[in-house]
Design a protein with these regions (language model features):
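C-terminal catalytic/acceptor-binding lobe
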Residues: 2-7, 16, 36, 203-220, ...
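Acidic donor-binding segment of Leloir-type glycosyltransferases
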Residues: 40-85
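Glycine-rich, basic loop-to-helix element that forms the pyrophosphate-binding segment
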Residues: 87-104
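A recurrent flexible, glycine/aromatic-enriched loop bordering the glycosyltransferase active site
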Residues: 94, 170-191, 197-217
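The conserved acidic donor/metal-binding loop of glycosyltransferases
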Residues: 113-117
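Short aromatic/hydrophobic "clamp" motif used to bind/position activated sugar donors
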Residues: 109
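Conserved donor NDP-sugar-binding/catalytic core segment of glycosyltransferases
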Residues: 121-182
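N-proximal low-complexity "stem/linker" segments adjacent to membrane-targeting elements
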Residues: 1-43
Length: 285
């Protein structure tokens, strides 16, 4: 259901419609960042959503941290279903995403990293875009706002809107499409948005190499290309698992980013410290 306002928080909960979006959040050892992420999620008051949180922290107790627990209570008071999972065995990022996807039931799934704050209205814009474009996924690439004064025209020159609908395409390392990765550095999308002058509340779809940290998929289409079932091909220490899934979806159904992006990267140190194995190099070799 859409969020109940504070005047209704103490009223008995009433089962509403099935959520339009399952928000899938993997987390490990990041209580402050996770609380900020959940605060941004609670601000998405205009969309039916359910939270599925999977904790791989050593104690499996992220939900008990005061700030995290407070934000979970807000979501529940708003009438949002919350599912808390622990997943102690560390078999890698792809396996953890596979585990989360197995617990999803909504027609769309938002994979949201635990270090991303969302501007109010972000999920609604993504959902509107996914439905309008009828493609496999729509992403809101994260922006580091410490870079707002750092304009990088050499990195944004590859920006290319989808003007006549989203089409399937093949992206691989070494193709021209792969060069789009630079769009998502620093605060590049904020600069692109300001140059475009998008109408308030609107969005413009554009071509991507891939989108990290905040991606809304059509669940059926993601699962039809295998989802993250490729995880056994990878060692536990890897990166780029989301790239594999997105490239497969793009080949069949197309995918897009949208600008403006309301996703803000918290710029905390990464928890993925060993990136020697890049999943696309293994899966697409």
């Amino acid at each position: 259901m859409t969020a109940r306002w504070s005047g209704d928080w103490a009223r008995p909960r009433v089962d509403g419609t099935a959520p339009a979006v399952d928000v899938l959040v993997p987390t490990v050892g990041r209580s402050a960042e996770l609380a900020t992420t959940l605060a941004g999620l609670a601000a998405q008051v205009d969309v039916d959503l359910r939270l599925v949180l999977s904790d791989q922290s050593a104690d499996g107790d992220a939900a008990s941290r005061p700030a995290v627990a407070a934000m979970l209570r807000v979501l529940e008071a708003q009438g949002r279903p919350v599912t808390l999972l622990t997943h102690h065995e560390r078999l890698g990022l792809a396996e953890h995403r596979h585990f989360l996807l197995d617990h999803a039931s909504a027609p769309t799934v938002l994979f949201l990293d635990d270090d991303v704050w969302l501007e109010p209205g972000s999920v609604r814009r993504m959902l509107d875009a996914l439905r309008t474009l009828d493609c496999g996924f729509v992403g809101s690439a994260v922006q580091g706002l410490s870079y707002l004064a750092d304009r990088r025209p050499h990195e944004t020159a590859v920006f290319e809107p989808w003007s006549d609908g989203v089409e399937p395409e093949v992206v691989r390392r070494g193709t021209p499409a792969h060069d789009r990765w630079s769009l998502h550095n620093a605060a590049n999308l904020a600069h692109v948005a300001s140059d475009l002058g998008v109408e308030h509340g609107g969005w413009v779809p554009y071509r991507v190499a891939w989108v990290g940290a905040c991606v809304l998929y059509d669940r059926e289409r993601l699962e039809s290309v295998g989802g993250f079932r490729f995880w056994p091909e990878l060692p536990p220490e890897h990166a780029g698992e989301d790239v594999v899934a997105q490239w497969r979806v793009m080949e069949r159904f197309g995918g897009a980013g949208i600008v403006p992006s309301g996703a803000v990267h918290l710029e905390s140190p990464t928890t993925v410290t060993d990136r020697r194995v890049d999943a696309p190099d293994v899966v697409f070799r």
